[in-house]
Amino acid sequence: MRKYNAASPDELALVNAAKQFGYEFQGIDEEDNMLIQDHINKQLLQFKLLNVCEFNSTRKRMSVIVRDPSGKIILMCKGADSVIMERLSQRSRNGDVLSKTQDYVDEYAEEGLRTLFLAERVIDEEEYERWNAEAQAAKL
């Protein structure tokens, strides 16, 4: 049985949950490819890790940008429910789902449980290049 080292208990829980659903994290290779064994379709998936925005107390979330096996660029975030919910697109805010989700969050909070939200958005190449240039300039 593989033992994982994680930066946080949340990350370890997510990796273990993914494994229970048939997706086993294999590691990150020397070319920054995240390797995921898809036990459902019996294939090894490679997600190119493009950027990581680490968690901090100001952002209250962590984000990664990856290129998936089909070439799509995907922004993935995990963080506090309030932070993720306020950043949802207008399309995602419509309907009963958001209200029902908030009901569950409130119920879990009453039970003393903490919630963690996951969100993703596909971004086009041009938007990514623009964002990445700004991010790299900010590091200097």
Regions found by a protein language model. Give the residues of each.
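Cytosolic catalytic regions of ATP/NTP-dependent phosphoryl-transfer enzymes
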Residues: 1-140
